[in-house]
């Protein structure tokens, strides 16, 4: 494990004992509305770009415990076409036990071998890049994702655009930086999403109403075309 990946592992170890993280993880209304919102956008993107979900081959970078993998299966993806990478060993064990039918890559995603079998229609990341504070490593990972992508495929991106003043282990990534990371892309389409978490956690059932105002959204979904 290199220095940068070790930093990420250490960050997540600290989060396990962070009272704010523990408290927010159980916020039903915010988690429900935020997840439903982004899954709707993913669905619209995928149905617009691909004719048959059953033929799409996808790789998720930093899949965690597999919440998104369940979503892609519900959308019509076949298990044999769903692939996942995870750096953290405890989360990887959950993936291995929960998804014995999919192909898994443990450790640093930059170490995934590039070959004909390891090329994908979609390479997906969700809140991975904001945990990487080193610019060089972000560029390296973006280049690896690009190299794993088939021509005509997309990098599907979900992450927050603004810094979290209460968490120095993360750094927001705006449109300009995404464009620089994937400067080989012929076209990037952005969608603003996710009501600002400090607001969303407080307003509960009013999330959909306040989320009508784009200036209150803090995250970006990006379709990054190859």
Model-identified regions with their sequence ranges:
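N-terminal, positively charged/glycine-rich alpha-helical extensions of SAM-dependent methyltransferases
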Residues: 1-25
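Conserved alpha-helix/loop element of class I SAM-dependent methyltransferases that forms part
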Residues: 35-54, 71
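Class I SAM-dependent methyltransferase SAM/SAH-binding core
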Residues: 59, 65-112
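A short acidic, Gly/Pro-enriched loop at the edge of an enzyme's catalytic core
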Residues: 114-123
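A short SAM/SAH-binding and catalytic strip from SAM-dependent methyltransferases
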Residues: 122-136
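A short glycine-rich, Lys/Arg-flanked "PGG" loop and its adjoining helix->strand segment in the class I
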Residues: 139-151
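Conserved beta-strand signature within the Rossmann-like core of class I S-adenosyl-L-methionine
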Residues: 152-159
């Amino acid at each position: 494990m290199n220095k940068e990946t070790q930093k990420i592992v250490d960050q997540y170890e600290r989060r396990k004992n962070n009272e704010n993280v523990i408290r927010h993880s159980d916020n039903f209304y915010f988690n429900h509305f935020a997840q439903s919102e982004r899954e709707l956008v993913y669905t619209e993107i995928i149905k617009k770009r691909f004719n048959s979900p059953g033929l799409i081959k996808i790789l998720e970078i930093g899949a965690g415990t597999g919440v998104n993998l369940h979503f892609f299966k519900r959308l019509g993806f076949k298990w044999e076409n769903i692939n996942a990478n995870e750096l953290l060993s405890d989360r990887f064990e959950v993936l291995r036990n929960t998804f014995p039918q999919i192909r898994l890559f443990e450790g640093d995603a930059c170490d995934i071998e590039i070959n004909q079998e390891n090329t994908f229609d979609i390479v997906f990341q969700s809140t991975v890049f904001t945990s990487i504070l080193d610019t060089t490593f972000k560029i390296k990972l973006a280049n690896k994702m690009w190299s794993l992508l088939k021509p005509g495929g997309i990098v599907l991106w979900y992450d927050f655009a603004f810094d979290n003043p209460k968490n120095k282990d993360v750094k927001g990534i705006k449109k300009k930086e995404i464009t620089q990371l994937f400067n080989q892309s012929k076209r990037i389409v952005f969608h603003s999403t996710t009501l600002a978490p400090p607001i969303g956690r407080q307003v509960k059932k009013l999330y959909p109403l306040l989320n009508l105002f784009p200036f209150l959204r803090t995250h970006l979904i990006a379709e990054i075309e190859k």
